[in-house]
A protein has these predicted regions:
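N-terminal periplasmic "start-of-domain" segments of outer-membrane beta-barrel proteins
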Residues: 32-63, 97-100, 107, 112
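Short acidic/polar hinge/loop motifs at secondary-structure boundaries
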Residues: 78-80, 107-136, 156, 180-183
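Surface-exposed extracellular loop regions of Gram-negative outer-membrane beta-barrel proteins
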Residues: 107-108, 359-365, 420-423, 427, ...
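A beta-strand signature from Gram-negative outer-membrane beta-barrel systems
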Residues: 124-166
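Transmembrane beta-barrel wall of Gram-negative outer-membrane proteins
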Residues: 212-312, 342-345, 504
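Outer membrane beta-barrel strand-and-loop segments of large Gram-negative receptors
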Residues: 398-402, 436-443, 447-454, 546-548, ...
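Gram-negative outer-membrane beta-barrel transporters
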Residues: 465, 477, 579-581, 600-683, ...
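C-terminal beta-signal and adjacent terminal beta-strands/loops
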Residues: 628, 675-682, 703-752
Length: 752
């Protein structure tokens, strides 16, 4: 029966809109002119948003070039109602990353994180994209698992032959030409015994096995400026065109962090000063091959590799344990992603098949606690039983297929998505300098699979000035996570959902004005990690993260109203009002019973929550050489947990983006400003207040000079360099303070 339902939802045939103009006369051959319009200019993006049946916002590569933004994560914060956490995770209309989804071309992107439902947008460089569109109201032909925004990233297209080279360098006020520490990662020995065999080994054998682990020394050196480079070329030959683009980047970041927590309003639990050294290396390649004939076909493949090498020194006092602390950690994260998709248009049909591979390795996460008794004149020593060496690997394969067909104004369609994930970890601590003790638990591995069959019917019709887009989407989901408890007994989490998701989009179109109304039902499903009975210790956050097998999906009801005005080409003014009602929202909370020195973060479903707000956007060309833009979002939310009311986790009360552009001949000068209101970083409990992230002002300045065959860009990032602060309202104290550096970058692009 389950298989039948999946097949039934995949059978409906889906539609596509043809960009084809056909000229036919008697006794003449039929001529078909096909084009692939490039949406890279600011005007083209405004026109796309204006014509769209759903409420959306977006940004083009032409606009991104006027900013210091190097990754999609940097660029997204320029879009109305969008904020970014940690330079990579997205919040839309104040909703945390888990309420948002992302697509690369026509394929849903997987979560890149082992401990949350989130895509790391800093993985994709802006050099590989043409535009980003964010849908904020739903339609039947879109995936149903989102509420804040559906981010649709379009990679580069080619319309003529070209060859481009880019070279760049960057300077950080805190990190460049400074003393830096790093340590090499260590692969897990291939001949090391299994957990069971190691545990039953004698001490002599354990010492021999322990020698297989390398103990690399800490490297100390002066940093060099950040470097990046790339090349891309396009080739057009008749009906075929191809594009290849590749880029590499190396960066150094140094953060000084103050970290503390309290047992009471005045009594400290710990007080640390951390220095965090991060070296990042990334490489990206994009290959597109397109056939433009009577029918069109395209193959698009993106390959990304990113490696983060982190080392941290921690000094301070732990008053709970009565210790002076002089500890260090090293961590390595390797992400490898392949996204490949093949799509085609055949008359009134279109189809898409895709494959995603996501590999994430954490080779040799090491914690080395060095302590002495507080206030005692004695040497520091390693607390062996608190040492930590951790290896983990996660792989996720996903396969998807969609087929569409249109019958005039009626569109029907269906699709299928399959995801398979495996996660495994090995954890050790030292009993002495030459012998490891394995502390891996049965909960430290899980497998998961996800099946989603979908089908929809959509009606898109114009009645004079009124345009109607309405439909029903049905999604049938099978969701399984398998792990073990501490005793070794299997623990399985199985979910089966059948969801009917109606949507209605109305627009009333005048010559320069548009009125929009939207109603829809969407949902938020738990991520594999959020329901897996697996605890992971995060030394940087000083907290453990644990899944909740009882976590349920959230149903969300959305209402949107929008007024749009387009005075002139490239100009727009808009006002949006929106509201959302959540049934069983999903949130990350601090578990009851946690103490500041041992926080436990997990996930829960409060009964209900709501969110409402207003968005304003203004873009005006004042003169031929001067234009201004601003977008502002003001929001409020409320969730009631056992009679205690608070805002949703991750939701800010306001978001502000503003900027000015000056253009004179071949020179462009841009100033961009961004500010996000305070938001809950982690939800507390009775006796332990919520942890808030404070707002800060971000100012960027860019100078762009057009050359005969290229351009040169000078960018000043985060000019104010204000620190990030985390605090608790009731205590009115800073728990965490992280410095943010000012940056200068210089980039040269040449078209050869």
């Amino acid at each position: 029966m389950k298989l039948f339902l999946l097949l039934l939802l995949c059978v409906p045939l889906l539609s596509f809109s043809q960009d084809t103009i056909t000229f036919k006369e008697q006794n003449l051959t039929e001529f078909i002119i096909k084009s692939v319009p490039k949406k890279i200019s600011e005007v083209s993006i405004i026109n796309t948003i204006r014509r769209s049946s759903v409420i959306s916002d977006g940004i083009s590569i032409d606009f991104i070039k006027k900013t210091p933004d190097r990754t999609v994560g940097d660029a997204l914060k320029r879009i109305s109602g969008i904020t970014i956490q940690n330079d990579k995770f997205i919040l839309v209309r104040g909703l945390a990353d888990r309420y948002n989804s992302a697509m690369l071309n026509k394929t849903l992107l997987p979560s890149t994180e082992p401990d949350r439902r989130a895509f790391s947008f800093d993985i994709i460089p802006t050099a590989l994209i043409d535009n980003i569109i964010v849908s904020k109201s739903a339609s039947a032909n879109q995936p149903g698992d989102w509420s804040g925004g559906l981010v649709q990233i379009t990679t580069k297209e080619v319309s003529d032959n070209f060859f481009n080279i880019s070279l760049g360098s960057g300077w950080g006020s805190v990190s460049t030409l400074k003393d830096f520490k790093s340590i090499q990662s260590t692969a897990f020995p291939s001949t090391f015994p299994s957990t069971y065999n190691y545990r039953i080994s004698g001490n002599g054998d354990k010492r021999l096995f322990t020698k297989q682990f390398n103990n690399p020394i800490v490297e100390e050196f002066k940093t060099i400026p950040n470097l990046n480079g790339g090349l891309s070329f396009g080739y057009v030959n008749g009906k075929f065109n191809s594009l290849f683009s590749s880029s590499i980047r190396n960066t150094f970041t140094l953060n000084n962090i103050e970290r503390k927590d309290y047992q009471s309003s005045t009594e400290l639990a710990y007080d640390y000063k951390d220095i965090l050294y991060t070296k990042r290396s990334s490489s990206n390649s994009l290959f597109n091959l397109t056939y433009l004939g009577k029918n069109t076909y395209s193959l698009k493949t993106l390959v990304n590799y990113q490696k983060d090498n982190t080392y941290m020194d921690r000094n301070g006092k732990n008053y709970d344990n009565i210790q002076d602390v002089h500890s260090n950690l090293s961590n390595h994260i390797n992400n490898f992603i392949i996204n490949s998709q093949f799509d085609g248009n055949i008359k009134t049909w279109d189809f898409n098949v895709g494959y995603n591979l996501m590999l994430r390795e954490q080779p040799d996460y090491r914690v080395n606690p060095i302590t002495k008794s507080l206030g005692v004149n004695e040497p520091y020593s390693t607390a062996w039983r608190d040492t930590y060496r951790f290896w983990s690997g996660m792989d996720e394969n996903s396969f998807n297929g969609n087929i569409n067909k249109s019958f005039g104004n009626i569109k029907i369609g269906g699709g299928y998505l399959k995801k398979i994930r495996g996660f495994d970890a090995r954890i050790f601590r030292y009993l002495s300098t030459d012998m490891l003790d394995e502390i891996t638990n049965n909960t430290d591995r899980y497998t998961a699979d996800f099946d989603l069959g979908s089908g929809y019917v959509m009606w898109d019709k114009e009645f004079g000035l009124l345009k109607l887009n309405t439909g029903i989407r049905t999604e049938y989901n099978l969701f399984n996570v398998s792990t073990s408890d501490f005793s070794g007994s299997k623990v399985k989490v199985n979910r089966e959902y059948l969801d009917v998701l109606p949507s209605l989009n109305l627009s009333y179109n005048l010559e320069k004005t548009k009125y929009r109304f939207s109603l829809s039902k969407t949902l938020a499903r738990p991520e594999f990690r959020e329901v897996a009975n697996f605890a992971y210790y995060d030394f940087v956050r000083n907290a453990q993260l644990l899944g909740n097998p009882n976590l349920e999906k959230s149903d969300i009801y959305n209402l949107d109203l929008k007024w749009e005005l387009y005075p002139k080409t490239g100009e727009n003014i808009s006002v949006s009002v929106f509201g959302k009602n959540f049934i069983k929202p999903i949130e990350q909370i601090v578990a009851d019973g946690s103490v500041p020195s041992n926080l436990l973060l997990t996930y829960s479903n409060p009964d209900k929550a709501y969110l409402y707000g207003v968005e304003l956007e203004f873009r005006k060309k004042v003169t031929d050489w001067f234009d201004v833009y601003t977008n502002t979002s003001i929001m409020n939310s409320e969730v009631n947990v056992n009679g205690i009311k608070r805002q949703l986790q991750g939701q800010s009360n306001y978001v502000l983006n503003s900027g000015v552009n000056f253009k004179k001949k071949n020179n462009i000068f841009n100033i961009s400003y961004n500010k996000v209101g305070s938001r809950i970083s982690a939800v507390g409990f009775q006796g332990y207040p919520d942890i808030f992230e404070n707002s800060r002002d971000i100012l960027d300045v860019t100078i762009l000079h057009k050359l005969k065959n290229g351009e040169i860009k000078l960018a000043f990032g985060d000019v104010f360099g204000q620190p990030s602060k985390y605090y608790q309202n009731l205590r009115n104290i800073n728990l965490i303070k992280i410095n943010n550096e000012q940056t200068i970058s210089l980039t040269l692009n040449l078209n050869l």
